[in-house]
Amino acid sequence: PYEKIGAELVKEVAKKTDDVAGDGTTTATVLAQALVKEGLRNVAAGANPLGLKRGIEKAVEKITEGLLATAKEVETKEQIAATAGISAGDQTIGDLIAEAMDKVGNEGVITVEESNTFGL
């Protein structure tokens, strides 16, 4: 029964990450899986589940604060191209994304579809 709860939790984490950020689902899934595994191990060893929950919540708060403190705004076309290029693993794709974002503006929508053709 605990494994099913853990699997549902990991699935929910991946979906929420995709909905909110659109990226990072693999990282979120690995982190959630580790939290569930270690949490169950600690509870089985006698740890207080509510104490674990409070500890996880405090850790999340501190990590979030740290990330927000070091986060940088991505504003220029060049910054967008560099960031998108890193994310895509291909600078040409990053440049195309930056160009598309430049054309549609901050409120615009860009739709990306898979293609069976090779190259761009």
UniProtKB/Swiss-Prot annotation:
GO biological process, one term: protein refolding
Pfam families recorded: Cpn60_TCP1 (PF00118)
Compartment list: Cytoplasm
Residues holding ATP: D23, G24, T25, T26, T27
Keyword Acetylation: no
SUPFAM superfamilies registered for this protein in UniProt: GroEL equatorial domain-like
Assembly with partners or alone: Forms a cylinder of 14 subunits composed of two heptameric rings stacked back-to-back. Interacts with the co-chaperonin GroES.
Cellular component GO terms held in the UniProt record: cytoplasm
A molecular-function term among this protein's GO annotations: isomerase activity
Natural source organism: Mycolicibacter nonchromogenicus (Mycobacterium nonchromogenicum)
Record key words, sorted: ATP-binding, Chaperone, Cytoplasm, Isomerase, Nucleotide-binding, Stress response
Keyword Isomerase assigned: yes
Domain of life of the source: Bacteria
Primary location group: cytoplasm
Catalytic activity of the protein: ATP + H2O + a folded polypeptide = ADP + phosphate + an unfolded polypeptide
Enzyme Commission number(s): 5.6.1.7
Function in brief: Together with its co-chaperonin GroES, plays an essential role in assisting protein folding. The GroEL-GroES system forms a nano-cage that allows encapsulation of the non-native substrate proteins and provides a physical environment optimized to promote and accelerate protein folding.
Family per record: Belongs to the chaperonin (HSP60) family.
Protein name, as recorded: Chaperonin GroEL
